[in-house]
Amino acid sequence: MKIFVEKRMMGRINYPKLIKKFPKIEFVDNLDGHEDVEALIIMNSTLNKLDLDKFIRLRWIQLLMAGYDNVDINYIKSKRILITNARDVFSISIAEDVIAKILYFNRNMKYYQDCMNDKVWNPISKEPEIFNSTVGILGSGSIGKELAKRFKAFGVEQIFGYKKSKDKPENFDQIFNDEEGLETILKSSDYIIIALPLTKDTKNLINSERLQLLKPNALIVNVARGEIIDQEALIKCLKQKQIRGAGLDVTTPEPLPKDSELWSLDNVYITPHNASSSPYMKDRLFELTLMNLERFLNNHKLKYLI
């Protein structure tokens, strides 16, 4: 059996471990002349460059990312190819990034950095707390669950979730799955976290009308996809100080153009789609690869099937 692995995503230590663990498998790290591979362990960007019709023995694709909005899932499934993603790999680091963005605003970190630069000692009183607040998490998958766990530790009063199904994951106080419920979350929450996949239903989910529902002290943090928020409506909302601020790890487009007004707004904190960054990322991808590869070889159900 021959399997392609995107070597750079495994790390220089883990890739040899993979070869040692499965000595009967021929692992390749390029696809030139290897159209007979039976599995691809691959980044979305690499996959999108391939003509899958050439890979007549292909049975499984393991994406090395959680998001798959840029992958033609229907086409892959039409060819009876199994496809899985890496949804749990990035959840911890993304959840920590969300907390960092909230604390950036709550503890006035930009202001105090400016004070340091100017050698000024000028404290602010009555800085907001996460404690006793209401949090709305749009998306209660692996990222949402890690977020809820952390917000509980901060002593929040309520955690609302918005998701398709009605089941209530641990640490959530209430789950909504319709438009009325979404409006309740937006009207009630001090912190709105977007952790939804991008689909035709979630594109521009947070539009101008829904931004108007947010409390004046609300913070909105997007670690999902930029297109879930109507960016022009958000810019208008922020310029008019209708909400306290926005922490954005994702924008439309990416990279964010230098002439975008978002760069100059004092109530925005932008990071370059880097919330998942972690020294443990490659190890977690390696562990996921090991687990699903074992399942694939033994004809067991794969984890994180799309």
Predicted regions and their residues:
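Rossmann-like adenosine-cofactor binding region
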Residues: K166-E261
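Hydrophobic/small residue at the entry helix of a nucleotide-binding pocket
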Residues: I143
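C-terminal helix-to-coil terminal segments
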Residues: T84-D97, Y111, T252-I306
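NAD(P)-binding Rossmann-fold cofactor-contacting core
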Residues: F154-N171
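A short, aliphatic-rich alpha-helical micro-motif
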Residues: G33-E35, L52-F55, I130, I185-S189, ...
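Phosphate-binding beta-alpha-beta segment of Rossmann-like dinucleotide-binding domains, i.e.
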Residues: I81, A86-T134, E146, F154, ...
